[in-house]
């Protein structure tokens, strides 16, 4: 009776973390008490793996370090308990068979039980292999010691798995938060046309985050339970090894087999390369286009216009602006061939070049065409890089003749100039372009090594107007501006504008 009471008292003053009698007990405001060293170590572990969260290891109620109080009453009980020992009579009863009252001296290998000599002769143990406890105690001590070492190793693996799953959980949270931030930033600049797509994509990300973190949280809980199970087994083995021979041998084979057959449950994880891609309709293409412009703008060069001897073109003093003095120019409708009655009509083409030649690398610039109802711009190749350019005699807007340009006529008709047929080598074919929002500013990007020329509608969030591919850059190319018959100037924008 007394031993049962003592066991109940001992349980009340046992640390839930180390499972030993409390040492320098500290109590939380939730009522649970822990060893000072144990709760301090738990606090440090929480700071490492739970981003500063402090909660009771038993009930998980949060606490503040300043609210922890020493529990002197419990400390006194522990001190008294350490002085109390079982009476000789109670100790003697523990060593005797509960059924026969005889001394427990034998060990039954088949049943893994400590028995008396009458038990050995009973039907229950007849034919079993029995040994004196002294004969097998050392053997099983070694086996349990080996099992303990194996279990400790598995505990380390379990703790590492627990730490890894927490780290992965935090990594996923950071990664998805980072993705959400980027998505929000991109949508902020495309707000007028992407409000619905942003909301939909963020909902998908939230669902993805919820599903992944829910699964990882479940795995984390399983890993915590697994680790706790390991601690309990280790505590049991340590108790056996430190206790009597009877404690050592009672059920020893079963626990050894259980430990030997134990396998650690691995958490379900998610590989980042298995993540879904943007699924919003057309959103990926829109964002890629926007990012293409963002990347192109990294190569913005400060383009100025070269002097020329064309009487119809007027270049401003800052060499950034060109306008037409003579409005006469020949321009056919989209979808038709560009023709001239005679070569003298070339004299009415008022195109001018940028002063910078492009022979390698990536180059980007922007042209302000606001309020103009006609213009041609892009790049051209093949002219001498001297101080004066005279290109009046050679304007034939075809890529095979060194022109990669787009144009506007009548205020709303946007076109790209492509190579004409072999029957009309001097007549480019004009293909209409679909432009939803008329650009006030056009970005031009040349990738010399990739042999591409791209045109962006800056007014419409950088949407791609047209892209020339497989350009034959056999000569240096130059920025090209032609204000055409419209007297409103074209202006080269500075990188800081």
UniProtKB/Swiss-Prot annotation:
Keyword set, alphabetical order: Acetylation, Antiviral defense, Autophagy, Coiled coil, Cytoplasm, Immunity, Innate immunity, Metal-binding, Nucleus, Phosphoprotein, Transferase, Ubl conjugation, Ubl conjugation pathway, Zinc, Zinc-finger
ZnF (B box-type) residues: 92-133
Keyword Protease appears in the UniProt entry: no
GO MF entries: pattern recognition receptor activity; ubiquitin-protein transferase activity; zinc ion binding
PROSITE patterns, alphabetized: B302_SPRY, ZF_BBOX, ZF_RING_1, ZF_RING_2
Catalytic activity: S-ubiquitinyl-[E2 ubiquitin-conjugating enzyme]-L-cysteine + [acceptor protein]-L-lysine = [E2 ubiquitin-conjugating enzyme]-L-cysteine + N(6)-ubiquitinyl-[acceptor protein]-L-lysine
Modified residues (Phosphoserine): 87
Residue ranges that the Swiss-Prot or TrEMBL entry lists as coiled coil: 137-225
Pathway as given in its UniProt record: Protein modification; protein ubiquitination
Amino acids binding Zn(2+): 97, 100, 119, 125
Pfam families, per database record: SPRY (PF00622), zf-B_box (PF00643), zf-RING_UBOX (PF13445)
A GO biological process held by the record: regulation of lipopolysaccharide-mediated signaling pathway
Keyword Ligase: no
Gene3D superfamilies: 2.60.120.920, Classic Zinc Finger, Zinc/RING finger domain, C3HC4 (zinc finger)
A Gene Ontology term for the protein's cellular component: P-body
Compartments it resides in: Cytoplasm; Nucleus
Stored InterPro entries: B30.2/SPRY, B30.2/SPRY_sf, Butyrophylin_SPRY, ConA-like_dom_sf, SPRY_dom, TRIM/RBCC, Znf-RING_euk, Znf_B-box
Protein family: Belongs to the TRIM/RBCC family.
Subunit structure: Can form homodimers and homotrimers. In addition to lower-order dimerization, also exhibits a higher-order multimerization and both low- and high-order multimerizations are essential for its restriction activity. Interacts with BTBD1 and BTBD2. Interacts with PSMC4, PSMC5, PSMD7 and HSPA8/HSC70. Interacts (via B30.2/SPRY domain) with HSPA1A/B. Interacts with PSMC2, MAP3K7/TAK1, TAB2 and TAB3. Interacts with SQSTM1. Interacts with TRIM6 and TRIM34. Interacts with ULK1 (phosphorylated form), GABARAP, GABARAPL1, GABARAPL2, MAP1LC3A, MAP1LC3C and BECN1.
Main function: Capsid-specific restriction factor that prevents infection from non-host-adapted retroviruses. Blocks viral replication early in the life cycle, after viral entry but before reverse transcription. In addition to acting as a capsid-specific restriction factor, also acts as a pattern recognition receptor that activates innate immune signaling in response to the retroviral capsid lattice.
Domain notes per entry: The B box-type zinc finger domain and the coiled-coil domain contribute to the higher and low order multimerization respectively which is essential for restriction activity. The coiled coil domain is important for higher order multimerization by promoting the initial dimerization.
Stored PANTHER family: E3 UBIQUITIN-PROTEIN LIGASE TRIM
Protein known as: Tripartite motif-containing protein 5
Species per Swiss-Prot/TrEMBL record: Macaca assamensis (Assam macaque)
């Amino acid at each position: 009776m007394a031993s049962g009471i003592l066991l109940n008292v001992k349980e009340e003053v046992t640390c839930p973390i180390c499972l030993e009698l409390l040492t320098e007990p500290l109590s939380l405001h939730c009522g649970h008490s822990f060893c000072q060293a144990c709760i301090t170590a738990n606090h440090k572990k929480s700071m490492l793996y739970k981003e500063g969260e402090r909660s009771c290891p038993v009930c998980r109620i949060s606490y503040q370090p300043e609210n922890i109080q020493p529990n002197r009453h419990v400390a006194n009980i522990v001190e008294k308990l350490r002085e109390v020992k079982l009476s000789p009579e109670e100790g003697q009863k523990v060593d005797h068979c509960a059924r026969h009252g005889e001394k427990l001296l034998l060990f039954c290998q088949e049943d893994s039980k400590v028995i008396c000599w009458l038990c050995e002769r009973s039907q229950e143990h007849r034919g079993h292999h029995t040994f004196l406890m002294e004969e097998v105690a050392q053997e099983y001590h070694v086996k349990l010691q080996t099992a303990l070492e194996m279990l400790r190793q598995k505990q380390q693996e379990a703790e590492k798995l627990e730490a890894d799953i927490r780290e992965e959980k935090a990594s996923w949270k950071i990664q998805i938060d980072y993705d959400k931030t980027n998505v929000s930033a991109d949508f902020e600049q495309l707000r007028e046309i992407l409000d619905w797509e942003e909301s939909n994509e963020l909902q998908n990300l939230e669902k993805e985050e919820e599903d992944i973190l829910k699964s990882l949280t479940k795995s984390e809980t399983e890993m915590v339970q697994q680790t706790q199970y390991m601690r309990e087994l280790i505590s049991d083995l340590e108790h056996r090894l430190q206790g009597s021979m009877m404690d050592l041998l009672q059920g020893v084979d079963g626990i050894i087999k259980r430990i030997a057959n134990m396998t650690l449950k691995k958490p379900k994880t998610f590989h980042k390369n298995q993540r879904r891609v943007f699924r919003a309709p057309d959103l990926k293409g829109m964002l890629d286009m926007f990012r293409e412009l963002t990347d192109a703008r990294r190569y913005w060069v400060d383009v100025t216009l070269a002097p020329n001897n064309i009487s119809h073109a007027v270049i401003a003093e800052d060499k950034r602006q060109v306008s037409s003095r003579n409005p006469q120019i020949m321009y056919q409708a989209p979808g038709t061939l560009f023709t001239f009655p005679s070569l003298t009509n070339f004299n009415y083409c008022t195109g001018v070049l940028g002063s910078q030649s492009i022979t390698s690398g990536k180059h980007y610039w922007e042209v302000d065409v606001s309020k103009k109802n006609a213009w041609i711009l892009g790049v051209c190749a093949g002219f001498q890089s001297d101080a004066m350019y005279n290109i009046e005699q050679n304007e034939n807007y075809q890529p095979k003749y060194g022109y990669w340009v787009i144009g506007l006529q009548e205020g709303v008709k946007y076109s790209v100039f492509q190579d004409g047929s072999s029957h009309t080598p001097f007549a480019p074919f004009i293909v209409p372009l679909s432009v939803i929002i008329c650009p006030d500013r056009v970005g031009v990007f040349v990738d010399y090594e990739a042999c591409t020329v791209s045109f962006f509608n800056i007014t419409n969030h950088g949407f791609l107007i047209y892209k020339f591919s497989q350009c034959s850059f056999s000569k240096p190319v130059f920025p090209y501006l032609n204000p055409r018959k419209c007297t409103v100037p074209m202006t080269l924008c500075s990188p800081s504008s």
